[in-house]
Design a protein with these regions (language model features):
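Sec-dependent signal peptide recognition
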Residues: 2-7
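Terminal, regulation- and interaction-focused segments at domain boundaries
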Residues: 18-47, 54-57, 147-149
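Compact, glycine-rich, soluble single-domain proteins
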Residues: 55-101
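C-terminal partner/receptor-binding element of secreted or periplasmic proteins
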Residues: 118-151
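Beta-strand/loop substructures that line and gate deep hydrophobic ligand-binding cavities in soluble
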Residues: 102-127
Length: 151
C-alpha cells in the first residue's frame, strides 16, 4: 500500500511539474496600459505588423451574462497577435505543420484583487519551432518591464 501511495504521489508531482510547461508567464510591476504599450512597441520596433488585438476581458464581460457567468476573471486582458513573415516562412519550411503556431500571440492581463502588477504570457513553442520562435517571444515579453514574478 505504501508503494502504491508513493507511486501515486510521484505521478501526481510529475503531472504538476509539466502541467504548464507549454506557457511562459511573468508579472511586471507596471500598469496594464504601460505594459501593453511596451509590448506593442517591442513588436513594431522589430518591423513586425500587429494583425489584431483581441480584447479578451471585454468579450468575457459582454458574453458572461448570456451564459449565466458572474465571476470576473480579468480586470483587463488583451492578446496581441502578430506575424513575422521571414520567421514564419522559415518555421513552416522546416515543417508545414507549424502553421498552427502562426500568428504569434502575447497576452497582457491583470487579475481582480492582484495589485502587484500586470501579467505577460505566451504559448511556448515546442520542437524545432521553439528554437526559431521562443527567443523572439521572450525578447518582446522582456521589454514589458522588470519582472516581479515569473512561472
Amino acid at each position: 500500500m505504501r508503494r502504491l501511495l508513493a507511486l501515486f504521489v510521484l505521478v501526481a508531482s510529475i503531472n504538476l511539474a509539466f502541467a504548464e510547461e507549454w506557457m511562459v508567464r511573468r508579472q511586471v510591476g507596471s500598469s496594464f496600459t504601460d505594459t501593453r504599450d511596451a509590448i506593442v512597441t517591442a513588436v513594431e520596433n522589430r518591423g513586425i505588423v500587429i494583425n489584431y488585438t483581441a480584447r479578451i476581458a471585454d468579450m468575457l464581460e459582454r458574453t458572461g451574462a448570456d451564459i449565466g457567468a458572474t465571476r470576473k476573471i480579468f480586470d483587463q486582458a488583451e492578446t496581441v497577435e502578430f506575424c513575422s513573415a521571414s520567421l514564419s516562412r522559415k518555421m513552416m519550411e522546416s515543417s508545414p505543420h507549424y502553421i498552427v503556431l502562426c500568428p504569434f500571440t502575447i497576452s497582457i492581463y491583470t487579475l481582480p484583487g492582484d495589485t502587484r502588477g500586470t501579467w505577460v504570457a505566451f504559448r511556448k513553442p515546442q520542437g524545432r519551432a521553439a528554437r526559431m520562435v521562443e527567443g523572439l517571444l521572450r525578447e518582446i515579453a522582456a521589454e514589458a518591464g522588470p519582472e516581479i514574478r515569473s512561472k
